[in-house]
């Protein structure tokens, strides 16, 4: 066995390696894009929850400044809702 490798075989090997690297890069880019989309969705969900909590807190704070009669009426409506 001579250990001689022709130039064509080396070029073919390099081409195969380049193809594998290209596929790996595409797969990595796809995974990164999917992760970024998931992170944006999660962030939007968290922001929506925070927004709802802020609105509820704002309602409660406003209620503290109302007259006792208005608070009593508000509690009835709020319990029904």
Swiss-Prot record:
Organism's domain of life? Answer: Bacteria
Checking InterPro entries in the record gives: DUF5446
Record-given protein name: Uncharacterized protein YppD
Gene designation per UniProt: yppD
């Amino acid at each position: 066995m001579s250990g001689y490798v022709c130039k064509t075989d080396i070029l073919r090997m390099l081409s195969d390696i380049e193809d594998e690297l290209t596929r790996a890069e595409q797969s990595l880019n796809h995974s990164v894009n999917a992760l970024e989309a998931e992170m944006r969705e999660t962030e939007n969900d968290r922001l929506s929850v925070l927004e709802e909590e802020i609105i509820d807190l704002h309602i409660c704070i406003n209620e503290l400044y109302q007259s006792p009669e208005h608070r009593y009426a508000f509690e009835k409506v709020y319990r029904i809702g």
